Amino acid sequence: WDKSIDDIGLDRGDAVIISVPFSGSGRKHERWKWLIEECNTKDIPVFVDCAWFGTCFDVEVKLNHPCIKMVAFSTGKGLSCGNWRSGIVFSRLADDDRCSLELQTEWRHGIHLNVAIANHLMAKYGPDTMPKKYMEAHAAVCEHYGFETTNTIHIAVAPQTPEWREYHRDETFNRVNIAKAIKRWKSNGNFAQ
């Protein structure tokens, strides 16, 4: 997979998977509007991965475009229950086998304990809980390390310098997961050396 949409464009028969917020930058993808218009025009199906829902803020997209066929949400990051994975997929393909229970597990059954834990947490915490709790820490960590803040609490964008090169995504973003630094700062006000 050495070519991307930026390299070769989109044609009928293609399919698109995109994350919201975009995993490369922790923000809405800068070409979201163009991508959706192009996919609507060329009848290209789109799968939207919203795994970071609950950790992001001020990211707004409409998911009712005809090209968007499936949208997935996860509870791992937003409810801080990563070891108890659960999520939901919404689909326009209701009669299609791709929407069957097979998507959940090879054993053809849901993981009921994980779903029960997620339901309990969702009843208690809203999608803005993490951003509200960690917004100040996110800004402090980004300022301390010279990162750009993003719209995703646990993600920052590092400068395009050699010391951050290992974090690059497609030569465009040096995305850094700052979750541990945020928790450290939030609990004792310290930064790692």
What are these regions (language model features)?
Residues W1-Q193:
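PLP-dependent class I/II
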